[in-house]
Amino acid sequence: GFLRKLRKATSDCIIDMEGERFSGVLSRLSGAKNRYGPTGKNAHRFYNNPRALNYEKHRYNAFGEILDVLVTGKAPANILPYTLGSEVREAVKGFLESKLITQPFVVIHPGASADYKKWPVEYFASLVTQLKSQNLGIVMIGVGDDTRMIDAIAEQLPNVAIHHFDQLGYPELVALFQKAQFYIGGDSGPMHLAASAGLDLVALFGPSKETIWAPLGDHSRVLRGTKACGKDCDAWQCEFNYHCLTSLIPEVVFGAATATRVAIDMRKPAFANETKETNP
């Protein structure tokens, strides 16, 4: 089974970023001689190299503290130098051509790992209508519960072409992001992947602390609603039904999207001039 395969891997080192009970148990059962993970309750049972992390800082920095003793140098906190094979780029090009997407397009991920992070379906429908008025193609990504949300958005817009890509792995997603004009979505893994690929993005935040979970990068905008979170607002309950997110209206997000497009256009001439100077 899985545990047998895990132990047969004979790893010298296990690094547990999650620090949860399940991942800690797997770290211990791996048989690795060196097991690194965050300090916490029962950490001594799982790791022989526990690390005290500052969880008040951005998770990028907190997780980096585990690696400080193992590697030299720092990983970039902005764009990562992804290396993609030609077959990956050709696959994404084929996806776009099959959907007849020839105009600039925006990638939207409406889903999230928890309901309290999800912007309302009707808001996404309104936003898509406004984006289409600017002749932007709409590409939505997501699987599982995300698919049901995307279907609900599409039902409200029977005459609008919404292209759903649900068969993409991580390399294909990066290739898609590198072709897109910008990204819109809530606090989720794809949001961070888009930022690391260098894509301009508009992030829709509710109770999540942006000091810890905001997308990194020079071209990321984090939006919140006009109403503050309640004192008890967390992943399990909110006396105001998470109005910190629901008070973020589509018109504000569309305004941020428009500003993002303007910023992209303003960067293009400088890039063109730089290319001209370095390539006479």
Write out the residue ranges for each language-model feature:
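Catalytic machinery of carbohydrate-active enzymes
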Residues: 1-280
